[in-house]
Amino acid sequence: MNLKLLHIFLLSTGGTLLLCTPLIHTTELVNGLVIGKMCWFHLVMLFFSVCVFFVVLTKRTTAIAFLSSDLLLLIFTGTVLITYKWSLNPEPEKLIFIGQLVIFWFLLRYILTAYREFNFFFLFVGILTGLVEAVWGMQQLHGHAYSNHSLFRLTGSFFNPGPYSGYLAVVLPVGLWMALRFQKGMRCFGYICVGAILIVLPAGMSRSAWMAAVVACGWVYWAERIGWEKTKAVYRRNKNATIPFIAIVAILVGCAIAELYGLKRDSADGRLLMWKVTGKAIAGHPVTGTGLGGFPEAYAEMQGQYFGTEEATDKEKLVAGCPEYAFNEYLQIGLEQGIGGLIVFGAWLGSMVYYGIRNRQHGAAGGVLALAVFAVSSYPLQLPSFWVALVFLGAICVTKDGTQIRSSALSVSSACHITIISLLSLASVCLFILQKGQYEVYKRWGWMQTVYNNKAYESVSEDYKDLHDKLKHKPEFLFEEAQCLSKTGQHAEAIRVLERAKRLSGDPMIRYMIAKNRQTLGDYRETEEELLQAIGILPERLYPYYLLAKLYAEPEFYQADKLRAAAGAVLTKEPKVESTAIREMREEVKKIIEKK
């Protein structure tokens, strides 16, 4: 076989498998829709890095331009490492994943420079994954395929319609670009992809994805069919109509935003509250940030402080929650990596779009733009699928066709690029070895959850202890471990585990569990303090008031006035959703009051 053909076969296979990351779903793992994709990415990266290493050893040397995008990525990665809380180590898996992404970026930059045909090939495969997702969604809507969420019929290979719609919105402008740029077969394929996505996208009911799709597709159409010259010509001919036209467009955009806001008003109000609280939290950590994985704890703390002021409204308290993500990637990066990290990340995205325009890669630039818009009101960068898509699209944007290098770019000499690629490939192998046991760990946790959900706590308690060191960064695991400890009478140990979970998550159930264990041990003052803190963070939840009522009814801690106040809250506050649990709590509180 011709050596070049072998290179192309190996690299195209590796790239295709990486682009298929969003389609992976491993049911035997806990959170297999995310962890399964991450494990797949690491496995394929091992193959891909070995292939690139083989290519670089057997191919004539190719000089690579070191661009501002490469430098910005390295600076942002350095910022993540510097701000990370190594003592707590809240996101070890994400750190390894980020390391692989950086390596992937530079390996991809090399092969796109060496083989210009991969620019189009990878975009084609990316569009194909979007088409597969769209058809998958159609099958789910018609009941021919199972959804991954009990409340939604449409999820594709994701766990809810939000990220699914976001991924389609990222692929859509790339498909439109193909339909506009090429002829015959490729144009037909592009329109088929666009049509399939447009059929499914409205059903996802994701306003963020709709906005991303409209902005990115509008830009791609303008870049391919209109451009600056035609725009300037139209402007010169219709100068007097420019201001009225802009005013009309602004009014239409405002009406569209208002309509989207009214579509899911409570959801929109909840996100506005998240952004406000996150903004206040950023003001408390403007330079150093909280570090990767520090968002949930910092958010919960700031929300408690905010609700303690007169500025907070009753409506905000009603829609409040304790989210894992900020539903705005820029705010979350600003909180976790500081304002400096946010500026660097924004510059990195901007540089991709800039180079994409300069290199006439409007499809890839449109995909990056769609992801950037979607990230304003969602959480795409918390999922591996979007990072893989971003790296592919970004690398295609910044890599100029062929091996020519502009004088303004720093060129990595052919003498040292073999060493650099070799070191990157070796680093990728090392990162794979670091995480290779995670698949079995999550598989075992999945089995343990089955036993746990059947309430066989004693049977599985030792298994949770065995996996503690490997999964102590997962608050869900720590909560389950603490529940097993609590049910087997090990309350002090359960509290120790939950205190760590509290630093990793804003989930109020963790605080409630700490309070229940402290009450069992007779630490009534600490129990009261924990519950009052939980109420401060989420003042409209009924459960902490119910726990307070039971606490104040304890003979050793009986306080009649506080008992009546807590009971009154349980009986009078309106829950978000009526349920059997609410009715049972109210009945029990009534009995407690009658006895006292």
Show which residues each predicted segment covers:
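Transmembrane signal-anchor hairpin modules in multi-pass inner-membrane enzymes, especially those
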Residues: 1-82, 89-128, 178-189, 218-244, ...
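Alpha-helical transmembrane segments of multi-pass inner-membrane proteins
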Residues: 8-24, 42-54, 77-85, 92-110, ...
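Interfacial juxtamembrane loops and adjacent helix segments
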Residues: 145-151, 292-335
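Flexible juxtamembrane loops connecting transmembrane helices in multi-pass membrane enzymes
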Residues: 153-154, 213-217, 233-236, 245-286, ...
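Single-residue signature of alpha-solenoid repeat helices
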Residues: 460, 494, 527, 560-563
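TPR alpha-solenoid repeat register
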Residues: 477, 510-511, 544, 580
